[in-house]
Amino acid sequence: MANVHVKRPIIGISMGDPFGNGPEITVSALSDASVYTRCRPLVVGDYTSLSYACRVAEKLGRTAPVLHRIESVEDAFFTPGTIDVLDLGLMPEDAIPNSLNEETPKPFGVGASKLGGEAAFQYVKTVIELAMQREIDATVTNAISKEAINMAGHHYSGHTEIYAHYTNTSKYTMMLAHDALRVVHVSTHVSLREACDRVKTPRVLDCIRIANNACKALGIETPKIAVAGLNPHCGENGMFGDEEINEIQPAIDLALAEGICIPEKAPTPPDSVFSKALGGWFDIVVAMYHDQGHIPLKVKGFVYDRDADRWQA
């Protein structure tokens, strides 16, 4: 059983959609020996998909790790140059090319599929179960196709909702972080029209509380929280929308009464809140919807290299 006090925690990595980029990202990341100085990683996925990803790496002139198929966490080597794979055996061998020179058979490489969605869902479910059983200390997830998991009959809008369901968590939110910039969201994977409808006092208050507790868990004794407005200029006293007046401000007032630190004591205009956060005014921002929080964080955290035609973190 994993001990949370060990210097190198055991990290369970869900492989992601086998027909997506998860297998290649996993192989690339675990080819870096320095990863093993910080943690003990193992992959929950399929040996066949990772084998193909290793062949892709070799074709690109990279040194591919050796795959070690395991049946339980106790079987793992946790050795640089070796990837421990808890193989769920969900991918038929004929779904993955035997050679990089042959035409890729369906459904490999053709986008969302029921087969890929079912496999990806089971990888995520398994790492959650391992964590709940304390066999691993933390989880890391690769990308899944939300369309594919729904095709497979698992009706979730993303990882966050899957984790909430299998951990019996009723109040939760997605948090993104890059360096000192942290963001939680009142809503995520819903239409913009529905996102506006979800800005309600109880939900905003829940997210403020979650943000406060998350920062404390990260070692910030008295987190300074910003709560973004929804409308341009926070609605200009109702000229451009009244959510700030009727929903967001009441949540802020209730949070302040609980002793939560919200320095501005009011919604912060969305077009300036992240600049202030980057300048150190706030430890975390409560964003009202998906893109309001995701765009600034991804602008900060990712750079597109035009010459190399790829993203760089």
Spans of features found by a protein language model:
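Ligand-binding beta-strand-loop-alpha-helix segment within the catalytic cores
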Residues: 176-206
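Conserved beta-strand scaffold positions in the cores of enzyme catalytic domains, especially
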Residues: 84-87, 174, 183
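A generic structural signal for well-ordered coil/turn residues at beta-strand boundaries
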Residues: 79, 171, 180-182
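A broad detector of the eukaryotic-type serine/threonine protein kinase catalytic domain
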Residues: 168, 188-191, 232-235
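FAD-binding core/adjacent interface of flavoenzyme oxidoreductases
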Residues: 164-176
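Contiguous, glycine/small-aliphatic-enriched amphipathic segments in soluble metabolic enzymes
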Residues: 1-159, 206-226, 230-288, 292-313
